[in-house]
């Protein structure tokens, strides 16, 4: 069971995502960028769904804070369909994006794909570490 942090200030969207994901995953909720960073810093998060426009710290500030510590999957949520802005978030380290209003099947599929890809990378990273020389 993956732990998914949903950072979204709209309580209706939070509830929709919690209902969608909670059957197969543990969902942790944050309603501002500042709260999202705090919950992320508590550890154990496997994936982040991150709104772009948030009170406190906005989505790009939260993304930068996460990328300073981790490479876990981050999927941006946006009501904006500005391709240039979306491209910039992808270049800044987001793994994917979903435009609101979203299709629930698409959200579930994108979350599943990102979690699967993340799980596939972990054994390779462990293997790389094990192959390092013991005495540096």
State where each predicted segment sits.
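C-terminal output helix
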Residues: 84, 102-115
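Active-site residues of response regulator receiver
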Residues: 51, 78
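Short, Lys/Arg-enriched segments at the junction into DNA-binding effector domains
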Residues: 113-136
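Acidic catalytic/metal-coordinating carboxylates
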Residues: 32, 58-61
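Two-component/phosphorelay signaling modules centered on CheY-like receiver
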Residues: 10-28
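Acidic, metal-coordinating helix/loop segments flanking the phosphotransfer/catalytic sites
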Residues: 29-47
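Short amphipathic alpha-helix used as the core "switch/output" element in two-component signaling
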Residues: 38, 60-72
């Amino acid at each position: 069971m993956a732990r998914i942090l949903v950072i979204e200030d709209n309580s209706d969207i939070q509830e929709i995502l919690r209902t969608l994901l909670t059957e197969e995953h543990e969902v942790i909720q944050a309603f501002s960028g500042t709260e999202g960073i705090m919950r992320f810093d508590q550890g154990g998060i496997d994936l982040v769904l991150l709104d772009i426009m948030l009170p406190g710290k906005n989505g790009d500030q939260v993304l930068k804070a996460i990328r300073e510590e981790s490479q876990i999957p981050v999927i941006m949520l946006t009501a904006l369909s500005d391709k240039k802005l979306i491209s910039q978030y992808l270049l800044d380290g987001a793994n994917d994006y979903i435009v609101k209003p979203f299709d629930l099947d698409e959200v579930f599929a994108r979350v599943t794909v990102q979690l699967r890809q993340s799980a596939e990378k972990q054994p390779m990273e462990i293997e790389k570490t094990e192959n390092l020389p013991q005495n540096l």
